[in-house]
Design a protein with these regions (language model features):
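Loop/turn elements at helix/coil->beta-strand transitions in domains of secreted/extracellular proteins
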Residues: 7-11, 61, 94-95, 118-122, ...
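A short helix-breaking turn/cap at a secondary-structure junction
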Residues: 31-112, 119, 288-295
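Short glycine/serine-rich loop segments
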Residues: 1-69, 242-251, 258-263
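Sec-exported extracytoplasmic/periplasmic mature domains
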Residues: 4-6, 70-77, 117-121, 141, ...
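Acyltransferase
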Residues: 105-127, 149-156, 163-170, 205-222
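Short helix-loop capping/hinge segments that flank enzyme active sites or metal/cofactor-binding pockets
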Residues: 94, 142-211, 250, 256-262
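Second-shell loop/turn segments in exported
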Residues: 53-58, 101-103, 134-138, 203-205, ...
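Glycine-rich, small-residue loops and helix-cap segments
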Residues: 9, 72, 76-79, 108, ...
Length: 296
């Protein structure tokens, strides 16, 4: 994301488990797209959780994001459906978004909501009760404990085949200042995670996804919603667990110059909607500014 923000690259491909595309994209004032889980191949991604991990584009604008999404193998034809001309005429008129009440304390978010309303969007405030994803860390720990050795076996050269989390920790300790400046407590948590049968683990993951999807779909039904608008990666965990796609677009800068992103969330497999919403918002705001020291 930093390389894209500084104009060193046209685009980048990030990977997200729960916020790792949305957060850096927001923090660097670029457009980040986390697709419906399973949209793009996960082959080659260093895993945290094969259940949640996904690749996704990080770009300077929505059109570039759509082009890269096509190149990555999006099953929907973003360019044909939302081509250059369509992006220019993208509209938010009549689109019904849920907004989280507490997020309105952020003045940039409050202004973004005004911009959406001026563009014809309908905003419905919802309370801040969000799904309790009990055991989310357990999911990540148990998945990585299994997935990292599989990654080394399938992607690494002969030197590293057979490696696992314990072996990575051992290697890190050889140069702790460079390799582990923040310690290895998360890795240790993975090693300490109790074993769980495949059947029980599958049931556990499916239950978590059901909880997250129930939260979103109940709100959609109750308020006749098209989607949700959030900030940065504030609701990334719930969206990830539900397999919901999300796209963050530059929302402006606070008084210290810190970028923020307006994050659109759509129902499962409704990724195409994100491009239309994001293009419409980008068109009326154009918040991205090239960092001062990187202007040519």
């Amino acid at each position: 994301g930093v390389s894209v923000a500084a104009n060193f690259a046209v685009a980048a491909i990030g990977s997200e488990t729960s916020g790792s595309i949305l957060s850096p994209s927001s923090q660097n004032s670029v457009v980040g797209y986390k697709p419906t889980t399973g949209t793009f191949s996960g082959v080659g991604i260093v895993p945290i959780s094969s259940y949640l991990d996904t690749a996704g584009p990080m770009t300077k604008n929505v059109m570039d994001n759509a082009i890269l999404a096509q190149a990555l193998g999006a099953p929907y034809d973003v360019i044909d459906q939302y081509g250059i001309n369509s992006f220019e005429t993208a509209s938010l008129k009549g689109v019904r978004f849920a907004v989280w009440t507490s997020f309105k304390e952020n003045p940039l978010y409050a202004q973004a909501l005004l911009d959406l309303e001026k563009s014809g969007a309908v905003l419905i405030e919802i309370d801040d009760t969000r799904p309790q994803l009990n055991g989310f860390l357990k999911l990540l720990n148990a998945d990585m404990k299994k997935d990292l050795p599989a990654y080394f076996a399938g992607q690494a050269n002969a030197t590293y085949r057979g490696w696992d989390v314990a072996k990575v920790m051992e290697w890190n300790r050889k140069d702790s200042l460079k390799a582990m400046p923040y310690g290895q407590s998360l890795f240790q948590g993975i090693i300490d995670e109790p074993a769980i049968s495949d059947a029980d683990f599958r049931e556990f993951k499916e239950a978590m996804t059901a909880t997250a999807q129930e939260y979103f779909y109940n709100l959609i039904k109750e308020h006749d919603l098209n989607g949700f608008v959030s900030i940065n990666n504030y609701t990334a965990g719930a969206a990830a667990a539900a397999f919901f796609p999300a796209m963050t677009v530059p929302m402006g800068y606070d008084d210290k110059g810190q970028p923020y992103g307006l994050t659109f969330i759509a129902p499962n497999e409704a990724d195409q909607l994100l491009f239309n919403w994001a293009a419409a918002y980008e068109k009326i705001t154009k918040h991205r500014v090239l960092p001062e020291n990187y202007k040519n």
